[in-house]
Amino acid sequence: MTNVTIEQAVKGYLVFSAKEGKLFREGRSYLAGKTYHNRYLAIYEKLEDAVVNASQYPSEEGITIYEVSGWGQVTDFGKCKVTEWLKLDQIVAKKEWVALLGKQTNSNYASLRILAARLSEDAAVLKKLAQDKNQQVRSAVAENANTPALVLTKLGVAAEVNAMAI
């Protein structure tokens, strides 16, 4: 654990739920705004680590990952840094982090991958998930069959999803 000074401001990524208006870090949440004053907000240096954090909240809608900067007192915890002051710089495009989720084979990521695909109407991701070799992933597609029918029809997977749901 290392503290860095204001001159060593940190850039990184942070997970946010637009629906709840909260920021997430290890199960705790905080009210959101443009700038935050809370020493427990985590900034992940790598987008991959922020995506892993986001995958802990698969039932949340409107999950967003922000590119952020922190300044003031910053504590280094290795994969993440905790800062007293935090500024939202920009939203990371969903395509970027959905692609990282797609590289994960663990079925725990399935619900978030489906949610992200539905929100972005990423047909390729949905189709791939519907044909995944992992039964749990296919089941998660079936459980999330409220994906817009038009999208599923375009994919040609509506029949597969309905069959799995039965």
Model-derived regions: residue spans:
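Alpha-helix C-terminal capping segments
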Residues: 8, 35-37, 54-57, 116-120, ...
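Short, mixed-charge low-complexity intrinsically disordered segments
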Residues: 51-99
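A short, charged, amphipathic alpha-helix used as a generic interaction element across diverse proteins
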Residues: 34-61
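Hydrophobic beta-strand residues in large extracellular and virion-surface proteins
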Residues: 13-15, 44-46, 50, 63-68, ...
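N-terminal compositionally biased, intrinsically disordered segments and leader/signal-like regions
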Residues: 3-6, 36, 65, 76, ...
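N-terminal regions of proteins, emphasizing targeting and processing segments when present
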Residues: 10, 19, 55, 72, ...
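Alpha-helical scaffold segments
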Residues: 94-166
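Short aromatic-glycine-(Arg/Gly/Cys) micro-motifs in beta-strand/loop hairpins
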Residues: 2-41, 67
